[in-house]
Amino acid sequence: MEVKAKQLDSVNATASVKIPSGMIKSEVENLAKKASKSVKMDGFRPGKVPVSAVLKRYERELTQDAEQNLFKSAVNSALQELKKESKELVGEPYFEKFDRKDGEIIAELILSFKPEIKLDGYEKLIPEYQTPKVSKKEIDEKKDELLKRFATPEAIKTKRVLKEGDFAKFDFEGFVDDKAFEGGKAENYVLEIGSKQFIPGFEDGMVGMKIGEEKDIKVTFPKEYGAAHLAGKDAVFKVKLHEIQELKIPELDDEMLKKLLPGEEKASVEVLDEKLKEQIKNEKLFKLVNDELKGKFADALIEKYNFDLPKGIVEQETDMQMRAAFNTFSEKEIEELKASKEKYQEKRDSFKEEAQKSVKLTFIIDELAKLRKIEVNDQELIQAIYFEAYRYGMNPKEHLENYKKQGALPAVKMALIEEKLFNDIFMPKTEKSEKASKKEKEDK
């Protein structure tokens, strides 16, 4: 095997590799010999399977493993020539060229190493911003939202017709072709009018009804309705309205304050207002950071700091962006790209600049996190993945395993580090100083 290594810049090197067919064949045979001692095959006793039988059945898998082993050996040889260690590598070696002829393999690999980055003066790049203000009106609106969560429907005493936003207590029975259908009947059912819980047209048909009124409401089941025997069918619901209910919002008394401020010894309207003010401010700040500040800061960092980028990582990121973009391409565009290598390469190259920015920012974020001592431990990582699973109704353990299989855990961890980092950077200085002062007092 021939291996020639060449350093391209501070973080990239190439490894020209030539693997003779005889070496591949020899490695395949070695693997087959090892496998013959443990593989189970009908007609042969354990440990007595002939090498020829193993080769015949598993030649493809053995060849793949052999080539993988030889390339690992080639990479190690290249690292020795470059006077580098394997722990200095970032990402997998990237195949820039791979040819197979008469059993011989000729390949060009890109080996990439982590860049050394100095972020002197990065603080000057942090965008200036005003800590969001919170008005009394916003606090009152947030209080109303909280109280509405504890609201319960109560029957109205005044005489009026049913309107959107009311809760209706009623009986109903549905008919298709003058025949009642299973699951289409209920008594004293309570429904929020306008919630769109029922099929289209039903709730609109109830608007304007009076207490005690009976009415036939004509509707059509959606074509994609879950029950196939009803999908797309016209139906009539016989409805009798018993009660109109309105949400009764509870008073903000001592009992309610204890519910809204669990664990708070001195639960009061003032304490609640202060907590809501802080919550609203943080929500506004979170939006400001994500919509504006984060992008401005990232652009400034990318423009300010220049360093060699690991080519292999950039190529992998370019491939990933290209694959992701395929979902947005038209069928015609996809066919054109498949038919022309030149067009495919041209399209792929259009993602290169964005890929370079993404990779550059990732390394900058990583270095910034170290400077500011931002870390994400395994427990935080698992909690974030479990939370995501619960949010989308998925099995958390399976969701975690999928991330592991895809090798995506480092990307998730990096996203969490980035979130923590920007929260640390953009936390209001007043809040930081208040916390520092409080800690100093406690220490005393």
Curated annotation (Swiss-Prot):
Pfam families assigned: FKBP_C, Trigger_C, Trigger_N
Catalyzed chemical reaction(s): [protein]-peptidylproline (omega=180) = [protein]-peptidylproline (omega=0)
Entry EC number(s): 5.2.1.8
InterPro entries: PPIase_dom_sf, PPIase_FKBP_dom, Trig_fac, Trigger_fac_C, Trigger_fac_C_sf, Trigger_fac_ribosome-bd_bac, Trigger_fac_ribosome-bd_sf, Trigger_fact/SurA_dom_sf
Keywords: Cell cycle, Cell division, Chaperone, Cytoplasm, Isomerase, Rotamase
Main enzyme class: isomerase
Main location group: cytoplasm
GO CC annotations on file: cytoplasm
Subcellular locations according to the entry: Cytoplasm
A GO MF label: peptidyl-prolyl cis-trans isomerase activity
Spans through the membrane: none
Domain PPIase FKBP-type intervals: 165-250
A GO BP annotation: cell division
Domain comment (free text): Consists of 3 domains; the N-terminus binds the ribosome, the middle domain has PPIase activity, while the C-terminus has intrinsic chaperone activity on its own.
Family according to the record: Belongs to the FKBP-type PPIase family. Tig subfamily.
Task performed by this protein: Involved in protein export. Acts as a chaperone by maintaining the newly synthesized protein in an open conformation. Functions as a peptidyl-prolyl cis-trans isomerase.
Name of protein: Trigger factor
Native organism taxonomy: Bacteria, Pseudomonadati, Campylobacterota, Epsilonproteobacteria, Campylobacterales
